[in-house]
Structure formats: C-alpha cells, structure tokens
Regions:
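N-terminal intrinsically disordered/low-complexity leader segments
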Residues: 1-15, 157, 203-223
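Basic, helix-initiating cap at the start of DNA-binding domains
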Residues: 1-49, 190
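Hydrophobic/aromatic residues within well-ordered alpha-helical segments
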Residues: 18, 72, 97, 135-139, ...
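HTH DNA-binding helix-turn interface
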Residues: 34-35, 48, 55-66, 71
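Append "Primarily bacterial transcriptional regulators
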Residues: 42-45, 54, 93
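Hydrophobic alpha-helical connector segments
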Residues: 74-117
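Amphipathic alpha-helical packing segments from all-alpha helical-bundle domains
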Residues: 119, 126-151, 159-166
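Hydrophobic/aromatic-rich alpha-helical bundle segments in the mid-to-C-terminal region
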Residues: 150-196, 211
Length: 223
C-alpha cells in the first residue's frame, strides 16, 4: 500500500463506518419508537458520537433514517446503464428495475429486513415522505442522463428522456405506495410488474364502448 494514501483511505473507511452507524441507529430508533419520539441527540448517542458529528453526515433525522434507501436508485441506474443499447428506453428502465428486484448480491426492498416497515412509515409521516422524495429525485436526475445518453440526445433540448423516467419512476412509486398500503411484504415484485403492465398496455388502449359511455353519462350526471 502506498504510505501517502494510507491515512486518507483509513479516514474514508472510518467516515463510512460512522455514517453507517448513525444511519442504523436512526433506522432502529425510529422504527421502534416512531419518528416524532426520537431526537437527533438520541440517534447520536446510540451511535456513540456527538451532535456535531451527526450534523457532518446528515441534515436531519429523516435523512439518516432513509440513508439505506439511497443505494437502491444507484443500483437501478447501474442496471439501466448495462441494458442492451437497442432496447426501447422505457423497456430498458423496466428491465433495470426487474434486474434490481432479482439481483442476489444487493437485496431489493422486499428482501431487506424492516424496509417494508420504513416505507409504510414514510407514507404516514409527511417529513419522512418529503425526504424520500428528494432521494427519488436525485436518482431520477441520473436516470434522465443515462436515458439521454442511450438515445444520443441532449436532455435539455429533447423531452423524451425526462418523459421516459417520469413514466417509469411513476410506475415504481405507484407500486411502492400500493405495497405499503397492502400489508403484504412479499408482494412488491407483483405490484411493480402490474404497474408497468398498466403503463405499457391498458392505459394506452381505447376503453370498451360501454365503459366509455358509462364514464360520459357519469360526467353528465355530476354536472
């Protein structure tokens, strides 16, 4: 090992351990007690650091609680980069999500302990939901850049990458919300498949004549 790099590498590993300890402490305390019953000071104490150290790694307890979810967007984007170049953009996004669900090395949400409980809590707590939204937006910005690169376009001038990611990420979000409401931890893959099927198929189809007439009649009655 290069002696000049030894100290920075050690510092990096120590910083990673400290961040992980804070995130794990926040995760456990919030799921055990509830978000409103946990303070930043208690999280820092559980991780055996002080309040100032917490603030070097996280801006809020919500950010610390959700830190374990940040890597999932990166994994989906890594899978998206690896998809065949000739796949249509939305198909590539869907299959990247599928790759993330099935990857044995990096467990997706439904195979990680208590992630289901965390996402249920995020649906109930506005500040936690807002923090989760920021994580999703960061991942989606990277997804847009990847799709733009696949298409060979500038995402500032061509709307297709943003539309692709908005549609795919919207399907994933709808499935995640349905998963949190359903109370079935193992049901996530089915719900994600159902959401993408709806996006690719029935939502683009013309409704049957009877159904269309029924909708028109209902609208006339309400007005």
């Amino acid at each position: 090992m290069n002696p000049e790099r030894k100290t920075p590498e050690r510092r990096s590993r120590k910083a990673r351990r400290t961040r992980d300890a804070l995130a794990q402490a926040a995760f456990e305390l919030v799921l055990d007690r509830g978000l409103r019953n946990v303070t930043v000071e208690e999280i820092a104490e559980r991780a055996d650091v002080d309040r100032r150290t917490f603030s070097r790694y996280f801006t809020s307890k919500e950010a610390a609680v959700l830190d374990s979810l940040r890597g999932d967007g990166d994994r989906i984007n890594d899978a998206l980069r690896a998809r065949p170049a000739d796949e249509p953009p939305l198909t590539a996004y869907r299959r990247a999500v599928q790759d993330w669900l099935e990857a044995p090395g990096a467990q997706a949400w439904h195979r990680r302990e208590r992630i289901f409980d965390l996402l249920v809590l995020a649906e109930q707590e506005p500040t936690l939901y807002a923090a989760f939204h920021h994580i999703r937006v960061d991942a989606q910005e990277d997804s847009v850049a990847i799709v733009a690169d696949r298409l060979g376009v500038d995402p500032r001038r061509d709307i297709r990458p943003a539309v692709t990611v908005a549609a795919g990420a919207g399907a994933l979000l709808a499935a995640q919300a349905a998963w949190a409401r359903a109370g079935q931890p193992d049901d996530l893959p089915r719900l994600i498949g159902q959401a993408f099927d709806a996006l690719a198929g029935e939502l683009l189809a013309q409704p049957p004549a009877g159904q269309a007439q029924h909708s028109t009649t209902e609208g006339s009655t309400e007005s």
